[in-house]
Amino acid sequence: TPSNVDGSINIDILDKALEDISRLNKQKDNIILIRSTVTPGTTRSLQNKYSNLNIVFNPEFLTERSAKFDFINQSRFILGGKNKHTTKVGDLMKWRFGTSTPVIHTDYETAELIKYMNNCFFATKVSFLNEMKMIADKCNANWSTAIEGFVRDGRIGHSHLSVPGPDGKYGFGGSCFPKDIQALISFSEELDLNLPTLQGAWNTNLIVRPEKDWEKLEGRAIVKKI
């Protein structure tokens, strides 16, 4: 689900796929999984639109660099939808991946929000570390030692600490974090909410990554409508 120029999500591809499936679907017990990142309320709207489909929202938590490993070693399964449908999917997940991986059954909106919480938290973490790196550079602090001391607090976690990042650049790019943080900010505006923390994280990213390389990923990260 790429973003529009204004930051809101564009579900044209997803909607067209469901339209085709709805037209071809002949069985009442088929379950369709949506794994695309969509703002809360989107899946419910699509379920109402395509009432002959049984839709479950099952967000993926894969990184582009280690997608296969992440798929095999999932930390949890989030299933949003009607309980009778999420139960069937959950049973399949347990059969395939074993019973040790938690399966969380919930409604559409909660499942959709969990995915955004995940991506936007890590995007904010990246921006925070970039700001700390700016301070370290200005005051001649040893960045490697600072990170070592910082991460020794087990609550911090070891991910998204590298500045520059794995791509050798500052901030975050790619086809996920930029579109997702913009989408959640745009969605919050529709709800008449102001999110200064997320907005600040996005502003920092625009400063440290002025090339805005995600805008080159047309169709994946952004849709430029005329």
What are these regions (language model features)?
Residues P2-S66:
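Rossmann-like NAD(P)(H) cofactor-binding subdomain of soluble oxidoreductases
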Residues S3, I114-K115, P166-Y170:
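A short, mixed-charge helix-start or loop-turn motif at secondary-structure junctions
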Residues V38-T43, F121, G173-G174:
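Short beta-strand to alpha-helix junction loop
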Residues Q47-N58, T63-S159, F187-N194, T204:
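Internal alpha-helical scaffold of NAD(P)-dependent oxidoreductase catalytic cores
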Residues D137-I226:
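NAD(P)-dependent Rossmann-like dehydrogenase/reductase catalytic/cofactor-binding core
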